[in-house]
Amino acid sequence: MPISTAEVEHVALLARLKLSPEEKTAYTEQLNAILEYMDKLNALDTRDVEPTAHVLPLRNVFRDDCARPGLPREKALQGAPEVSEGQFKVPRVV
């Protein structure tokens, strides 16, 4: 099911994006190309393909977690633009 320009406009409105007519056309074409490709992928027979999480046999290699002393409070607060009662003071977020 192809995406219409009206649907792209609706999504842009929800995302608070202002798109030019050229951008609307381009995004409509790009999204439709993606959906066509998805249809091709959905048509593939994958019954005999083993599910994998990663195509390469790799594992994450992590370093050991070592606790180390942190910065003293005074040193950490030195570069702060504003400090109150030994803590960073930041503008209120409403």
From Swiss-Prot:
Q: Give the catalytic activity.
A: L-glutamyl-tRNA(Gln) + L-glutamine + ATP + H2O = L-glutaminyl-tRNA(Gln) + L-glutamate + ADP + phosphate + H(+); L-aspartyl-tRNA(Asn) + L-glutamine + ATP + H2O = L-asparaginyl-tRNA(Asn) + L-glutamate + ADP + phosphate + 2 H(+)
Where is the segment annotated Disordered?
72-94
Pfam families annotated for this entry? GatC
Keywords associated with the record: ATP-binding, Ligase, Nucleotide-binding, Protein biosynthesis
Single GO term (MF):
glutaminyl-tRNA synthase (glutamine-hydrolyzing) activity
Instruction: Read off the Gene3D superfamilies from this record.
Output: Glu-tRNAGln amidotransferase C subunit, N-terminal domain
Superkingdom of the organism of origin: Bacteria
In the UniProt record, the signal sequence range is: none
Q: Does the keyword Ligase apply?
A: yes
EC code(s) of this entry: 6.3.5.-
One BP term from GO = translation
Transferase as a keyword of this entry, yes or no, is: no
Q: How does it assemble?
A: Heterotrimer of A, B and C subunits.
**What does the function comment of this entry state?**
Allows the formation of correctly charged Asn-tRNA(Asn) or Gln-tRNA(Gln) through the transamidation of misacylated Asp-tRNA(Asn) or Glu-tRNA(Gln) in organisms which lack either or both of asparaginyl-tRNA or glutaminyl-tRNA synthetases. The reaction takes place in the presence of glutamine and ATP through an activated phospho-Asp-tRNA(Asn) or phospho-Glu-tRNA(Gln).
Family label = Belongs to the GatC family.
HAMAP family given in the database record: GatC
UniProt-recorded name of the protein = Aspartyl/glutamyl-tRNA(Asn/Gln) amidotransferase subunit C
